[in-house]
Amino acid sequence: MITKTYSVGDLKKYKYVVVLSYCNGKILLSRHNDRSTWETQGGHIEENETPLEAAKRELFEESGAIEYSIAPVCDYWSVTEDMSHGSNGMVFKALINKLGKISESEMAEVRHFDALPDNLTYPAITPVLFNYLVQMNDEV
């Protein structure tokens, strides 16, 4: 899989949002009920929803975040090596001050990490996006 980052607004139309979340100075990842792997918060942008609205909704649904600051970081585009399947979206960074309960219908748990774990749901996308933050000197 190939993943590339772009300046915010370069791609114009977005299908997904990805939220790179930090809580207490650590990376906050979620684990879906149907998987044993870890992932950032994010998902589809609904019809008539802005990327920011989608990011806030997904952040709450998948982490339980109730007090936070959030801002766009970059756009991303990802495609399989054979170019048959791809996705694009806007990436946000969230600094979470307070977590509430997560929706148990979708997520099994959230966990704090010092660094990205090996067992990521999207191993060809997630490290690229976090590395972008490091390159921009914008990590926590």
Predicted regions and their residues:
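Divalent-metal (Mg2+/Mn2+/Ca2+)-assisted nucleotide/phosphate chemistry catalytic cores
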Residues: 136
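Unchanged
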Residues: 45-69, 76-129
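Active-site beta-strand termini and strand-to-loop segments that position acidic
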Residues: 21-24, 94-96
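Short acidic DE-rich linear segments
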Residues: 139-140
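Conserved Nudix-box catalytic region and its N-terminal flanking loop in Nudix hydrolases
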Residues: 22-61
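Acidic, metal-coordinating catalytic segment for phosphate/diphosphate chemistry
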Residues: 1-18
